[in-house]
């Protein structure tokens, strides 16, 4: 099936007719489809028939999106019905006994859409809308249903939350692609987390109401999530405060709720107390509201790497938590793909099917990358093992739609899911007038680069023959590399002035500028490789200096961008494209040195600081520079710092330290750590650490640090036991 659907996608992208073109426009791919192949034009008018109860349904309203006039006397009839209505029973083949199932029958005389429920009927209309693109229909009989009951998105990333307009656009996208869940849980919303007891101010409350209503119109459950774990007290007062807050949200129009206890420690992490609270909420709020869907819960041990089987946190939840409550799970680690074995492991412990929170394409831990690749890696056989599957996206809402397009298809029809084909189709939908430019650019923005979770993605597979030519030293290698660079620069130029999706281009702009730098660097290196003359401008020396200059400009752009103060940086093509150009640079310089007796440095890399150590959650974090400030990227999770373990930052040159501070998220924790500096291979010298007051989580250094010369800094847990901390920031300033 993979090749079949990929070819269809490419035909559509190229505008080439196909006998399957109309049905193949439907996304997600239907479960069952009987195609006769006859294509015909949309009628100029049609008559719509439905029960009075369905006149105000979202399915009936969505039908208006098709540009056909309604005429009570038109010979072409569109019938909308529920399966339990008379018209639905007369439609013929019974539907699968699954929520949101629908059938769509299209003939030259009329259309009949039957849904098991109103949302299923709405999905049938959405499929008709997809099929009717370009003003054509196709005789067909579709029976369709979702593999996963709850499908969609959780806005659960750290960093800049989505704007209100971005959320509205997302909800439109979810409805269009048959996703029925949007969980509102932005970490920076104070009324979701830090001030969870407090009501929203009137203006913010109106925005929540608008989102909830807009979601309803798109067939999406708008979940409002509350995160009380940071400071909850297991008291009647706090229990009632939580229920009261949910009541206030209900009054704003919210009909779906989630409770998060992730990324915390201390009193709030107790499984029995969490279960007791959730059961109380379920009994005294959820079950008393007939129009509210089941409660969703994100536990503290939300992945296998953090689960402590000996303490039995997950088993306690499984045995005591009401079975109607959904339990979220990220997999074998915080960022991990899901397979059947991992689902068997968690489902046995929580005594229900896990509700997957998939941390892709979220980039809050690799903010220097933008992730435009396909959604792949999850098992195609796990549909019976999951109750829900939601994606945590990037803060770049429009760019996230590329991956979300595939996730919608995957959760609807797993067995026929083809990540590559879906990716091709997504590019066409997101930017149809510049699809090839977007595709070319996206090829170099798939992988996450080095990161604390060790989660990587395929990138640069299309460069395999080019890389092989470079490694062999083929004479054709420079031309092959240059062609790729020219295509990348052309794509970036086209996209930078595209006006059809301005929000997407705003999100991509920093990476588009860096892509141009990368392409310029590659072309300069290719000119070097072809240079035979050391006298005529540009000489080899000129091209060498130009190449090194562009690499430094790339580094400057990476570290001057201030979109994210905690982790600046703009990286493109770091997995294959940039290393390939660097290799060509090195081979070219080495060959020139050998032939001309010169001594040019053959490395163009510019990495002045490196991080190492034996704290697994930290050692893969990138190091960045802004002016004189050097920073380690923050981590969003609880750091389990082993006894005696340390991290070390090493500089390529001796630096003079001016100041330093870091935030491990806990007041008074400085006494558990030792900071040392060393110059070259010299002795380690300890630097005193202190907090400015008892409530200050920021750790400051003593005055002796100022003026110290160093090439290495080391921070060690000096206690004899594991320390659980955050890693909010780590900065030092050099002269």
Report each predicted region and the residues it spans:
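Beta-sandwich interaction modules
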Residues: 689-725
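Conserved, mostly hydrophobic/aromatic
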Residues: 48, 117, 153, 174, ...
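Feature activates predominantly on carbohydrate-active enzymes
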Residues: 95-245, 251-255, 287
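Disordered, acidic Ser/Thr/Pro-rich linker "stalks" and the adjacent N-terminal cap
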Residues: 580-587, 592-657, 663-673, 677, ...
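Catalytic-core regions of glycoside hydrolase
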Residues: 157, 245, 251-255, 264-424
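C-terminal functional modules
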Residues: 419-605
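Acidic, contiguous N-terminal accessory segments
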Residues: 21-108, 116, 134-142
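Bacterial Sec-dependent N-terminal signal peptides
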Residues: 1-25
């Amino acid at each position: 099936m993979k090749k079949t659907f990929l070819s269809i996608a490419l035909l559509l992208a190229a505008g080439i007719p196909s006998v399957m073109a109309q049905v193949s426009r439907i996304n997600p791919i239907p479960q069952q489809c009987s195609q006769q192949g006859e294509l015909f034009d949309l009628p100029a008018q049609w008559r719509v028939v439905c029960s009075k109860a369905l006149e105000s349904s979202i399915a009936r309203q969505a039908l208006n999106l098709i540009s056909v006039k309604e005429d009570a006397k038109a010979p072409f009839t569109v019938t909308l019905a529920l399966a339990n209505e008379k018209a639905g029973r007369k439609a013929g083949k019974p539907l699968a006994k699954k929520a949101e199932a629908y059938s769509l029958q299209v003939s030259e005389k009329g259309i009949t859409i039957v849904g098991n429920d109103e949302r299923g009927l709405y999905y049938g209309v959405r499929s008709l809308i997809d099929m009717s693109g370009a003003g054509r229909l196709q005789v067909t009989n579709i029976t369709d249903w979702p593999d996963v009951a709850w499908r969609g998105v959780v806005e659960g990333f750290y960093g800049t939350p989505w704007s209100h307009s971005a959320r509205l656009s997302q909800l439109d996208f979810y409805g269009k692609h048959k996703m029925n869940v949007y969980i509102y849980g932005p970490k920076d919303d104070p009324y979701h987390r830090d001030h969870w007891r407090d009501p929203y101010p009137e203006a913010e409350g109106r925005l929540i109401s608008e989102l909830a209503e807009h979601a309803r119109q798109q067939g999406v459950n708008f979940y409002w999530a509350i995160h009380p774990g940071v400071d909850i007290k297991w008291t009647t007062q706090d229990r009632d405060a939580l229920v009261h807050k949910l009541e206030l949200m209900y009054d704003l129009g919210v009909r779906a709720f989630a409770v998060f206890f992730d990324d915390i420690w201390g009193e709030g992490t107790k499984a029995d107390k969490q279960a007791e609270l959730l059961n109380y909420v379920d009994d005294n709020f959820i079950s008393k509201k007939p129009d509210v869907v089941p409660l969703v819960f994100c536990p503290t041990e939300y992945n296998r790497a953090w689960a402590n089987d000996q303490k039995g946190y997950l088993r306690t939840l499984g045995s005591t938590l009401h079975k109607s409550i959904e339990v979220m799970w990220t997999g074998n680690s915080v960022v991990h793909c899901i397979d059947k074995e991992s689902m068997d492991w968690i489902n046995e412990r929580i005594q229900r099917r896990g509700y997957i929170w998939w941390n892709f394409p979220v980039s809050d831990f690799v903010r220097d990358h933008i992730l435009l690749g396909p959604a792949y890696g999850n098992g195609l056989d796990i549909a019976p093992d999951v109750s829900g599957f939601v994606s945590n996206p990037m803060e770049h809402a429009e760019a996230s739609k590329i991956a979300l397009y595939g996730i919608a298809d995957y959760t609807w029809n797993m067995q026929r899911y083809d990540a590559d084909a879906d990716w091709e189709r997504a590019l066409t939908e997101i930017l149809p007038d510049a699809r090839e430019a977007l595709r070319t650019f996206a090829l170099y923005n798939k992988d996450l680069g080095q990161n604390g979770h060790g989660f990587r993605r395929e990138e640069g597979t299309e460069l395999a023959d080019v890389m092989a030519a470079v490694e062999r030293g083929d004479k054709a290698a420079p031309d092959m590399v240059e062609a790729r660079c020219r295509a990348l620069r052309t794509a970036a130029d086209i996209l930078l002035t595209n006006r059809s999706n301005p929000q997407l281009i705003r999100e991509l702009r920093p990476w588009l500028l860096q892509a141009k730098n990368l392409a310029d660097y590659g072309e300069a290196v290719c000119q070097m490789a072809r240079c035979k003359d050391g006298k005529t401008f540009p000489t080899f020396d000129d091209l060498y200096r130009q190449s090194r200059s562009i690499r430094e400009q790339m580094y400057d752009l990476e570290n001057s961008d201030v979109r994210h103060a905690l982790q600046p940086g703009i990286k493109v093509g770091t997995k294959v494209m940039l290393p390939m150009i660097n290799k060509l640079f090195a081979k070219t310089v080495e060959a020139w040195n050998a032939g001309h007796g010169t001594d040019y440095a053959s490395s163009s890399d510019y990495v002045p600081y490196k991080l190492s150590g034996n704290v697994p959650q930290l050692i893969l974090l990138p190091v960045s520079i802004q002016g004189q400030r050097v920073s380690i990227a923050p981590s969003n999770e609880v750091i389990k710092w082993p006894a005696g373990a340390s991290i070390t930052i090493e500089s390529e040159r001796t630096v003079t330290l001016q100041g330093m501070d870091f935030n491990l998220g806990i007041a008074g924790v400085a006494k558990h750590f030792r900071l040392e500096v060393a110059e070259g291979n010299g002795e380690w010298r300890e630097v005193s650490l202190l907090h400015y007051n008892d409530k200050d989580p920021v750790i400051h250094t003593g005055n002796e640090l100022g003026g110290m010369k160093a090439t290495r800094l080391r921070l060690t847990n000096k206690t004899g036991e594991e320390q659980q901390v955050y890693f909010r920031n780590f900065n030092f300033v050099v002269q």
